[in-house]
A protein has these predicted regions:
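Well-ordered beta-sheet/strand-loop patches within structured domains
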Residues: 1-249
């Protein structure tokens, strides 16, 4: 892709329609702050890779958005989320000469190369993300009668959110000659969800039944033992009388 000086490009316009008909597959997407499967999942890895190449080439970023949730394939503060209609990556050729952006992919790896006149860029750029803070998740509580009263189940453990400020450092002849803020990013925390039980304790009822069953068995056993003793006593008495009767005769 060639850009003349001053040309502005929209990532979404270049990609076009995201659908099965245009070759996109199902993968993980973030919708309303939640992870789910959708057509075109993973497209943000492409926009993020391009974004980092643009920053390192010191091209002008017109529009960029971070993801609503933390992602794990690049440093936080260096991602570029896209979503047709409300999130785009736009950039401009702010050099004095045409530039060419090349894309190389082999099925496992994607590379972007920005080619231009070396006279426009006689320095290097470094990307420096800086974490400003950690935001703890709030706690949401729901109730369920399918869980015994007094018990609490953690339905979702929750995740921290983060705020970042990202800088670019311009390095010339081994020295930092400029440090400039290029973006701010905020990643929303994911709530911790607890389910509090309001139902009856089935375990307690089971224990009562077990105890009643035990008592019944114990009583029955005791009765049998008593009957056995009475029977033995009666037999002993009978044998004793019989023996005495024989002796007398």
């Amino acid at each position: 892709m060639k850009l003349n000086p001053g040309d502005e490009i929209s990532f979404n316009d270049i990609v076009g329609e995201i659908s099965e008909a245009t070759g996109f597959k199902n993968a993980t997407v973030i919708v309303g702050g939640e992870y789910e499967t959708g057509i075109g999942g993973g497209i943000c890895q492409v926009s993020t890779t391009l974004y980092n190449s643009l920053i390192l080439s010191d091209l002008e970023i017109v529009e960029r958005h971070n993801h609503s949730r933390p992602i794990n394939y690049v440093d936080l503060g260096t991602d570029a989320a896209v979503a047709r209609g409300y999130k785009d990556l736009k950039f401009k050729n702010n050099t004095n000469n045409p530039i060419i952006i090349l894309t190389e992919a082999d099925g496992q790896k994607l590379d972007f190369k920005v080619l231009g006149n070396s006279a426009d860029r006689d320095y290097q750029v470094k990307i420096i993300p800086e974490r400003l803070g950690v935001v703890s998740p709030d706690v949401k509580t729901t109730y369920s009668d399918s869980i015994p009263e007094g018990e609490t189940v953690v339905k979702e453990s929750g995740k921290n959110g983060y705020s970042y400020k990202t800088y670019k450092e311009v390095v010339k002849n081994g020295e930092v000659v400029e440090k400039k803020e290029i973006s701010k990013s905020y990643y929303v925390p994911k709530s911790k969800v607890l389910v509090v039980g309001t139902g009856s304790s089935s375990k307690s009822n089971d224990d009562d039944e077990d105890n009643n069953s035990k008592s019944s068995k114990s009583s029955k056993s005791s009765k049998k033992s008593k009957d056995s003793k009475d029977s033995k006593k009666s037999k002993d008495s009978k044998d004793s009388k019989k023996s005495k009767g024989k002796k007398k005769s």
